[in-house]
Protein backbone atom coordinates (compact mmCIF):
# COMPACT_ATOMS: atom_id res chain seq x y z
CA UNK A 1 0.00 0.00 0.00
CA UNK A 2 1.23 3.49 -0.81
CA UNK A 3 1.59 6.35 1.58
CA UNK A 4 -0.25 9.01 -0.40
CA UNK A 5 -0.81 12.22 1.52
CA UNK A 6 -3.07 15.11 0.59
CA UNK A 7 -2.38 18.80 1.17
CA UNK A 8 -4.38 22.00 0.71
CA UNK A 9 -3.13 25.53 0.10
CA UNK A 10 -4.98 27.76 2.56
CA UNK A 11 -4.72 30.84 0.32
CA UNK A 12 -5.81 29.45 -3.06
CA UNK A 13 -7.55 26.16 -2.13
CA UNK A 14 -5.58 23.93 -4.49
CA UNK A 15 -5.24 20.29 -3.41
CA UNK A 16 -1.89 18.53 -3.90
CA UNK A 17 -0.87 14.89 -3.40
CA UNK A 18 2.50 13.73 -2.16
CA UNK A 19 4.18 10.37 -1.65
CA UNK A 20 6.67 9.56 1.06
CA UNK A 21 7.27 11.16 4.41
CA UNK A 22 8.50 14.60 3.34
CA UNK A 23 5.78 17.24 3.98
CA UNK A 24 4.97 19.94 1.44
CA UNK A 25 6.07 23.28 2.96
CA UNK A 26 3.41 25.97 3.20
CA UNK A 27 0.53 23.54 2.70
CA UNK A 28 -1.82 22.08 5.31
CA UNK A 29 -1.98 18.28 5.40
CA UNK A 30 -5.49 16.87 5.07
CA UNK A 31 -6.23 13.87 7.27
CA UNK A 32 -9.20 11.77 6.09
CA UNK A 33 -12.34 11.36 8.21
CA UNK A 34 -11.36 13.94 10.84
CA UNK A 35 -13.84 16.75 10.15
CA UNK A 36 -16.89 16.84 12.41
CA UNK A 37 -19.52 16.12 9.76
CA UNK A 38 -22.02 13.46 8.80
CA UNK A 39 -20.16 10.27 7.87
CA UNK A 40 -23.24 8.82 6.19
CA UNK A 41 -23.11 11.68 3.66
CA UNK A 42 -19.33 11.65 3.14
CA UNK A 43 -17.80 8.19 3.40
CA UNK A 44 -17.37 6.64 -0.05
CA UNK A 45 -19.52 3.55 -0.61
CA UNK A 46 -17.64 1.21 -2.94
CA UNK A 47 -19.02 -1.65 -5.05
CA UNK A 48 -16.58 -3.84 -6.99
CA UNK A 49 -17.98 -6.19 -9.65
CA UNK A 50 -15.21 -7.73 -11.71
CA UNK A 51 -13.18 -4.85 -13.16
CA UNK A 52 -15.99 -2.30 -12.67
CA UNK A 53 -15.75 -0.12 -9.55
CA UNK A 54 -18.73 2.05 -8.63
CA UNK A 55 -18.25 4.73 -5.99
CA UNK A 56 -21.19 6.57 -4.43
CA UNK A 57 -20.47 9.31 -1.94
CA UNK A 58 -22.39 8.55 1.22
CA UNK A 59 -24.94 5.93 2.18
CA UNK A 60 -27.25 8.97 2.21
CA UNK A 61 -26.71 10.96 -1.00
CA UNK A 62 -24.48 13.99 -0.56
CA UNK A 63 -25.83 17.34 -1.85
CA UNK A 64 -24.29 18.65 -5.05
CA UNK A 65 -24.94 22.39 -4.85
CA UNK A 66 -22.59 25.20 -5.95
CA UNK A 67 -22.02 26.07 -2.28
CA UNK A 68 -21.60 22.45 -1.04
CA UNK A 69 -20.44 19.61 -3.27
CA UNK A 70 -18.04 16.74 -3.82
CA UNK A 71 -15.18 17.97 -5.99
CA UNK A 72 -13.58 14.64 -6.85
CA UNK A 73 -13.33 10.92 -6.18
CA UNK A 74 -9.94 9.17 -6.22
CA UNK A 75 -9.46 5.40 -6.31
CA UNK A 76 -6.16 3.98 -5.07
CA UNK A 77 -5.25 0.55 -6.49
CA UNK A 78 -2.30 -1.78 -6.27
CA UNK A 79 -1.08 -0.22 -9.55
CA UNK A 80 -1.75 3.48 -9.11
CA UNK A 81 -4.48 6.09 -8.81
CA UNK A 82 -7.56 7.08 -10.81
CA UNK A 83 -9.38 10.38 -10.27
CA UNK A 84 -12.82 11.50 -11.43
CA UNK A 85 -13.75 15.18 -11.09
CA UNK A 86 -17.35 16.11 -10.28
CA UNK A 87 -19.38 19.28 -10.73
CA UNK A 88 -22.37 20.71 -8.85
CA UNK A 89 -25.70 19.28 -10.09
CA UNK A 90 -24.03 15.95 -11.05
CA UNK A 91 -24.71 12.82 -9.05
CA UNK A 92 -22.06 12.26 -6.33
CA UNK A 93 -20.79 9.06 -7.92
CA UNK A 94 -18.15 7.75 -10.29
CA UNK A 95 -17.61 4.53 -12.22
CA UNK A 96 -14.13 3.23 -13.02
CA UNK A 97 -13.13 0.28 -15.21
CA UNK A 98 -9.92 -1.13 -13.74
CA UNK A 99 -8.92 -4.43 -15.38
CA UNK A 100 -6.23 -6.27 -13.45
CA UNK A 101 -6.20 -3.79 -10.57
CA UNK A 102 -7.16 -4.33 -6.93
CA UNK A 103 -8.81 -1.42 -5.10
CA UNK A 104 -7.01 -0.50 -1.87
CA UNK A 105 -8.84 2.69 -0.83
CA UNK A 106 -11.23 5.33 -2.13
CA UNK A 107 -11.02 9.04 -1.26
CA UNK A 108 -13.41 11.91 -1.88
CA UNK A 109 -13.10 15.63 -1.26
CA UNK A 110 -16.02 17.80 -0.09
CA UNK A 111 -15.51 21.54 -0.51
CA UNK A 112 -16.90 22.18 3.00
CA UNK A 113 -16.06 19.04 4.98
CA UNK A 114 -12.72 17.99 3.57
CA UNK A 115 -11.18 14.63 2.79
CA UNK A 116 -12.91 11.29 3.41
CA UNK A 117 -11.61 7.76 2.90
CA UNK A 118 -12.91 4.21 2.76
CA UNK A 119 -10.32 1.41 2.89
CA UNK A 120 -11.03 -1.93 1.27
Q: Language-model segments: what does each one mean?
A:
Residues 111-119:
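Short acidic/polar inter-strand loop motif in beta-rich domains
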Residues 92-96:
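Short strand-edge motifs at loop-to-beta-strand transitions and within beta-strands
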Residues 2-8, 19-22, 106:
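Short metal-coordination and nucleic-acid-contact micro-motifs, chiefly zinc-binding Cys/His arrays
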Residues 9-12, 22-26, 110:
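Short cysteine-rich clusters marking metal-coordination/redox-active sites
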Residues 69-79:
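Extended low-complexity, serine/threonine- and proline-enriched intrinsically disordered segments
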Residues 102-112:
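Short, aromatic- and glycine-rich surface loops/edge beta-strands on solvent-exposed regions
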Residues 57-65:
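Short amphipathic, basic-aromatic surface patches that mediate peripheral association
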Residues 16-52:
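Transition segment at domain starts
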Amino acid sequence: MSNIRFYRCESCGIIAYAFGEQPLPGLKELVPNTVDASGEKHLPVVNVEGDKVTVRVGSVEHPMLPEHWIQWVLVETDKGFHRHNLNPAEAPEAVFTLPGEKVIAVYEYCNLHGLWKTSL
